[in-house]
Amino acid sequence: MAVPFRRTSKAKKRKRRTHVKLQLPGMNECSNCGEYRLSHHVCPECGQYDGKEVANS
């Protein structure tokens, strides 16, 4: 099996890993109550989605 000829430097390794990170969830403000909620999800505070009540709060 092939083995790297030279050791990978810290800079090269870190440049390669710049995209390996955690992403923050997409949060939007609820149009009804103003609380933050996940995009495309029912608001946990007021139970509304797309201007309609879909869950009991």
Swiss-Prot record:
GO BP term, example: translation
GO molecular function: structural constituent of ribosome
Keywords associated with the record: Ribonucleoprotein, Ribosomal protein
Stretch forming the signal peptide: none
Pfam families found in the cross-reference section: Ribosomal_L32p
Tree of life domain: Bacteria
A GO CC annotation given for this chain: large ribosomal subunit
Family: Belongs to the bacterial ribosomal protein bL32 family.
PANTHER family, alphabetized: 50S RIBOSOMAL PROTEIN L32, LARGE RIBOSOMAL SUBUNIT PROTEIN BL32
NCBIfam families: rpmF_bact
The protein's name: Large ribosomal subunit protein bL32B
